[in-house]
Regions:
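Auxiliary alpha/beta "docking" domains used to position bulky ligands
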Residues: 2-127
Length: 127
């Protein structure tokens, strides 16, 4: 809590303006949101090690390793998108998960049918 965190929400190339999504993200409580190219996202293999050896939650949540996507799967999925929105928040994981879930739904309803929020940390939305 209190630590800066960043998340990405991917969306397909559509006519809908990314500005609408940026405004919505900020309206939901994000500190900032900027469009990025998914092709510029670097997916490091070392990140999984931080989860495995640095987090007591390893293997306890289906959104975390070893159940989550591998770096290879993540890279492959990102390659299928033309646009992404990097969302910056100073909030905690639970509040940010809710923000991202609402933003993903909003994007989908605006025509970004492949919209999918990606983030780190355990998800407690279904607990």
């Amino acid at each position: 809590m209190g630590r800066d965190t960043e998340r990405a929400i991917s969306a397909p190339a559509q006519q809908t303006s990314m500005k609408l999504l940026i405004d919505k993200a900020i309206g939901l409580g994000a500190a900032d949101a900027v469009p990025i190219s998914p092709g510029k996202v670097v997916v490091g293999n070392w990140v999984r090690l931080k989860c495995q050896f640095g987090c007591g939650g390893w293997g306890r949540c289906l959104t975390c390793p070893p159940y989550s996507l591998t770096p290879e799967q993540t890279s492959k999925i990102l390659s299928e998108y033309k646009k992404a929105l990097l969302v910056h928040s100073r909030g905690s994981h639970p509040s940010l998960r809710k923000l991202m879930s609402e933003l993903e739904r909003f994007a989908f309803l605006k025509g970004y049918y492949k919209a999918f929020a990606l983030s780190c940390g355990p998800c407690n939305l279904c607990d």
